[in-house]
């Protein structure tokens, strides 16, 4: 499951430009 860094974000899919 991949989220836009919201709630739960995959470490490999994490984007610094998006809120955590």
Swiss-Prot record:
It comes from the Eukaryota. On the 2D-gel the determined pI of this unknown protein is: 5.6, its MW is: 36 kDa. This is Unknown protein from 2D-PAGE of needles. It comes from Pinus pinaster (Maritime pine).
């Amino acid at each position: 499951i991949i989220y836009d860094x919201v709630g739960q974000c995959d470490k490999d899919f994490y984007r610094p430009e998006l809120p955590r």
